[in-house]
Amino acid sequence: DIPQDGQFPLPGQYSHACELIEDIKKMGDFCIGAACYPEGHVEMEHKKDDIRYLKEKVDCGVDFITTQMFFNNDIFYNFLYRIREQGIMIPVLPGIMPITTKKQLARSCALSGTAVPQRFRAIVDYFGDDPAAMKQAGIAYATDQIIDLIANGVRNIHVYSMNKPEVAAAIMQNLSEIVK
């Protein structure tokens, strides 16, 4: 979380992920995952710098990376191409967040800088004021994203369920004949 006064780093804390990764490596043989940002970190001015920092994390010993949420799979595929071009060959888990309320979308995108494609914006605009319909539409959109990822060879996917196990269960039910 962002410190209340906005000052980084706090005393006794890490200023870069590599510092944490290196300390964890010293503690034992752990599998270490890290975050990555297919649309670029919200505070990063240039995408190439973002990939350079990701490469540093990988070189420090990260075993896999999980992406920040995205709503357009082409962004993920392009990101995957760009990092592979830079020699980042570890597993990449796409992060899919089922948006179940209009408020959740606004808050999540404000924090992450994630772009909302027109197709999804139309869904939120149409169903956003009906909680049950928005929840079902958000689950359907996330399911469609996952189906596309699977069809394009992605085998491991992280679902940001946001402490809503029923949402994850609904997605798994939707995929029950696809993922066996």
What kind of region is each of these model predictions?
Residues D1, A35-H41, F70-F71, G95-I99, ...:
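Active-site beta-loop-alpha junctions enriched in small/polar residues
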Residues D1-I24, M44-K48, M69-R84, K164-N174:
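Active-site-adjacent beta->alpha loops and helix N-cap segments on the catalytic face
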Residues P11-Y37, Y81, E85-I139, D144, ...:
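Active-site pocket-lining/capping segments in soluble small-molecule metabolic enzymes
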Residues D29, V62-D63, V154:
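A structural motif
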Residues E45-E56, G138-D148:
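Short, acidic/polar
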Residues K57, G61, P94, I157:
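Conserved, mostly hydrophobic/aromatic
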Residues F64-F70, N156-V159:
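Short catalytic-loop micro-motif centered on adjacent basic/acidic residues
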